[in-house]
A protein has these predicted regions:
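Conserved acidic E/D residue at the C-terminus of a beta-strand in Rossmann-like folds
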Residues: 211-216, 233
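Residue-level detector of conserved catalytic or cofactor/ligand-binding positions
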Residues: 229-235
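Conserved N-terminal/central alpha/beta ligand/cofactor-binding core
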Residues: 223-229
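Flavin-dependent oxidoreductase catalytic cores
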Residues: 1-189, 193-209, 217, 223
Length: 235
């Protein structure tokens, strides 16, 4: 009926698929098992749907189940599902779910697992993700670490979105980095997270920055975290 009334409208349908959560348990109550999703995908295409968006089912009050934090789901955990759906339909298929680097996104497209990459939390961390890739500056993309602290936790606490890796997020009107009135030589003592961020902002404002760090590695207390759980997670 939508196609009849608005023939030029592009209809994108989110295909909510449940994923395993231990033995005989699944994330995303109310979603579709993969076998049913495959049948439904073909029916949706036949009905005139233009694109399918493969994602974690999210009919639940626990957002941690459906927007998984670091270490709770592998990277690209929905890609195998989108690949299966793409094999069954001829319309474009998009996928989302812990695809956090340009390299990972490119691999999904290259191996035929999806036609489009959906970005959620990654755009809070770096709103210029796509622009940087288009300009050939993929190495400058700031990577979301999936901590869920500024985004998902804030949603559940009825607060506005923010990001622990992007201090401007949510404060774009008051925290814009603008050129300084006069250029100074600035020394930053300590190359921990705070020191590195201070150095980055100062440099963007046009100052000449020198960082002093007593150890052989930068990162500060982050280096301690790397020795604990989820050491394969991005930082």
């Amino acid at each position: 009926r939508l196609k009849t009334i608005v023939p030029d409208m592009v209809i994108d349908y989110k295909l909510p698929i449940v994923t395993p959560l231990g033995e005989n348990s699944f994330r995303g109550k109310g979603g579709l098992p993969l076998d049913e999703a495959c049948i439904f995908a073909k029916e949706l295409e036949a009905c005139g749907v233009d694109t399918l968006h493969v994602a974690q089912a999210n009919h639940t009050g626990n957002m941690g189940d459906t927007i998984p934090a670091m270490g709770t789901q592998p990277y690209g955990f929905m890609v195998s599902y989108s690949k299966k759906i793409k094999e069954l339909v001829s319309i474009p298929v998009s996928v989302v779910g812990r695809i956090v680097t340009p390299e990972a996104a490119e691999a999904v497209i290259t191996n035929g697992s999806a036609d489009i990459i959906g970005l959620g939390r990654s755009l809070l961390t770096d709103p210029d993700f796509a622009n940087k890739c288009a300009d050939g500056h993929c190495c400058n993309v700031r990577t979301c670490m999936m901590c869920n602290k500024g985004c998902t936790d804030n949603i559940q606490n009825r607060a506005f979105l923010s990001c622990v890796l992007n201090a401007e997020n949510g404060y774009e009107g008051s925290r814009q980095i603008t050129p300084a009135a006069s250029t100074k030589n600035i020394a930053i003592i300590g190359a921990g997270i705070a020191g590195l961020e201070a150095a980055r902002v100062a440099a963007l404002r046009g100052h000449h920055v020198t960082i002093f760090e007593k150890s052989l590695q930068i990162g500060g207390q982050l280096l301690i975290a790397l020795s604990l759980i989820h050491i394969s997670e991005p930082t």
